[in-house]
Amino acid sequence: MSFTRRKFVLGMGTVIFFTGSASSLLANTRQEKEVRYAMIHDESRCNGCNICARACRKTNHAPAQGSRLSIAHIPVTDNDNETQYHFFRQSCQHCEDAPCIDVCPTGASWRDEQGIVRVEKSQCIGCSYCIGACPYQVRYLNPVTKVADKCDFCAESRLAKGFPPICVSACPEHALIFGREDSPEIQAWLQDNKYYQYQLPGAGKPHLYRRFGQHLIKKENV
């Protein structure tokens, strides 16, 4: 059943592939805008181990009933001995025109000056409007604090101390890249690689870039 839901959610979205020439155009467009953080998930390097998700849970004190991040194992092809998987990161897209911000009655859901969509815990009343409005289904209500939670690129736990998000540091395959969207590292990667962005109806442009990749894995290893 979980595979069916994921397949349906992915099927509803718009997938736009870009090449290096397109990324240079994006870079020129962004020069006049505010600084934005962005993340790259290189699916060709990701092995689906979910070490990033476990590190995120520990660092950000997520309960067992909720998660800021997960790597979905989506079967693409199947045979007797091996299955080809697409490892897809499920987390906040930090999208422009985020519906979670629009529906929040207290202003607890907001975007900071670096483009990170965040939750102000002291203002959240636990109404779950933002959770229902998120088309990606990547928010949850913490059963202990009764506050909405989601990926915020470790804004308080890591970024404020000068460290990248814990998922980036924990990934054993170096499948995650994080930084200012206009930084040389991010722009060089976008220039040199074919990538895509996944956007669902009702949400604005995401700030999560993805490089498509699939992996053949023996069934007993998954």
Curated annotation (Swiss-Prot):
[4Fe-4S] cluster 2 binds at residues 56, 151, 154, 167. PANTHER family: PROTEIN NRFC, PROTEIN NRFC HOMOLOG. Residues 1-27 form the signal peptide. It comes from Escherichia coli O157:H7. It comes from the Bacteria. [4Fe-4S] cluster 1 binds at residues 46, 49, 52, 171. The gene is ydhX. Residues 37-66, 83-114, 115-144 form the 4Fe-4S ferredoxin-type domain. GO terms for molecular function: 4 iron, 4 sulfur cluster binding; metal ion binding. InterPro entries: 4Fe4S_Fe-S-bd (IPR017896), 4Fe4S_Fe_S_CS (IPR017900), ET_IronSulfur_Cluster-Binding (IPR050954). This is Uncharacterized ferredoxin-like protein YdhX. [4Fe-4S] cluster 4 binds at residues 104, 124, 127, 130. Gene3D superfamilies: 3.30.70.20. CDD domains: PsrB.
